[in-house]
């Protein structure tokens, strides 16, 4: 009982100071923080107590020896020299966990093999049978660490990692290990808050790990109480009477703690996550103590009779598009915490620390942590008591502008039945955004494009303004954060603007006049529907009856749909992108138009296609729409393209394909574009830019340029 051992509790990096504090509370004398763990000298009972009670540790290791080692033979000899017969019972199995390397030992599997060989040969040398290896569930798990020219050998008393409490089967969304979750709660001050009778709420609880760990803490239930198998269970040095005494004490404390009444609540809007949380709650034996409910972030509200802790582990977002979407989520989270949780303690655990600025909260403490290899931060803050959410002068001005724009557009929107429109377009210099509203068949969405700030602008100020803007937009449009889709507009090169920024595959349907279109608000910079050409498409639909229609640089084929619905005799849709041609096909089918001989889709480089068709099929089309990009140097194109430089050739080739009484509608978006004088002289040209700029783009009359061209 009084024999002292070298002991080590491993933990996630960043939790070492908290683990020192926890072990000290468990009676450990002079615990010392080391990298990814805490060391101490103590008796066997202190090690067993740590196995049973530590919420933050991942493993408890009992050290046997530390010796200099240079090569594989040294590994073998160090292992063979230890009296393994004092630790491994005859006929029992073993496994070796090896960590580290040097110039001679480069692979952990090889290192583990040499240590195992030393152990096996030692057992045979003292007359015991050769032990077998069982990597899944060994009777004795040996821990070997090679670092700094020294080999540390020990026994893993925990066996399976201590984070496995037994209640979590499926991870759900971005699973958080139980010991790291407990560490977050410890750092956020939950033990003190629970002692004072405060509640715990996770408004984005996922599979419920944070709430369940908080419940185990508050109810004084040892995290290892439900575990049957331990690393010391078959260890020859195990003293069962010590373990029984510790378990009996833990059961008494759990019974006493179970009489406490606290509000322990988790919300999530994902029904699958809530189902997982409920299953985990059942396995944890906390059915009557923890409440999980499907609820949106905007509906989250305080629980219990006293201020408590609201703790959140939002999604991390690995791709650019996901990170941009999280800006909206963080802004909405901060707004909800400020508006509804005054007097509470708050904590947000983020795998993208730069997003914490979008909370708009004054952070009292930041803790740098590692979730596996990922650098993370826990931000802790005290939420001030306040009435209505106070906005900055700039945010108030933005809200006023949105209201003004809506009032100006309301009558037109109602009269024309417009379901997708631009509400705001950089009207205020400090809020350089474009805001488009989509009234889809399944509800309202906001598509927000931030124009990238110049380097001279302070990044934190820019993040603050964006956060304010997103809050104002969501509140004005009365939509939740999942319906505000943020993009960042940077200077695009070549086909960059058409490359995906995310891969959700989510689509919605929006109405435009007689047509219905699929839009994607997340995966690309653009949505599949250029709103500034709404009038142009409607005019094409009116002009198409009985005509042969050609749509060049067709994008998602929206103009083709209008032409087909308008009674076009036939249509052909040409674009280089297979993605957008597939989208065009879906748009046709959505409107009851069957692609085929009458409505052809052709994947081709429009420049090469025009050059080939102009000579072979003159006068083939009665109505042509051509809306080329400003610039392109796509590797799939036979040549680079600049609309100012190349539009004369492009127009002349298109005019060769136009019937004598036909109409070519040419448009482009290049700022400062001017139509070639020779083209204007050779054809009957009429600029219709003003006629095709809709009221929602009146503030930006140069969003596109548009002409009608006919043969003279």
Curated annotation (Swiss-Prot):
Subcellular location field: Cytoplasm
THUMP domain segment(s): 46-157
Superkingdom, taxonomy of origin: Bacteria
Gene Ontology CC entries for this record: cytoplasm
UniProt feature coiled coil, ranges: none
PROSITE patterns attached to this UniProt entry: THUMP, UPF0020
Key words, A-Z: Cytoplasm, Methyltransferase, RNA-binding, rRNA processing, S-adenosyl-L-methionine, Transferase
Cytoplasm among keywords: yes
Listed Pfam families: Methyltrans_SAM (PF10672), RlmL_1st (PF22020), THUMP (PF02926), UPF0020 (PF01170)
GO molecular function: 23S rRNA (guanine(2445)-N(2))-methyltransferase activity; RNA binding; rRNA (guanine-N7-)-methyltransferase activity
EC number: 2.1.1.173, 2.1.1.264
Catalytic activities: guanosine(2445) in 23S rRNA + S-adenosyl-L-methionine = N(2)-methylguanosine(2445) in 23S rRNA + S-adenosyl-L-homocysteine + H(+); guanosine(2069) in 23S rRNA + S-adenosyl-L-methionine = N(2)-methylguanosine(2069) in 23S rRNA + S-adenosyl-L-homocysteine + H(+)
InterPro entries: 23SrRNA_methyltr_KL, DNA_methylase_N6_adenine_CS, RlmKL-like_Mtase, RlmKL-like_Mtase_CS, RlmL_1st, SAM-dep_methyl-trfase, SAM-dependent_MTases_sf, THUMP_dom
SUPFAM superfamilies named among the record's database cross-references: S-adenosyl-L-methionine-dependent methyltransferases
Stated family: Belongs to the methyltransferase superfamily. RlmKL family.
Its job: Specifically methylates the guanine in position 2445 (m2G2445) and the guanine in position 2069 (m7G2069) of 23S rRNA.
NCBIfam families to which the protein is assigned, alphabetical: PRK11783.1
Classification via HAMAP family: 23SrRNA_methyltr_KL
Protein name as catalogued: Ribosomal RNA large subunit methyltransferase K/L
Record gene name: rlmL
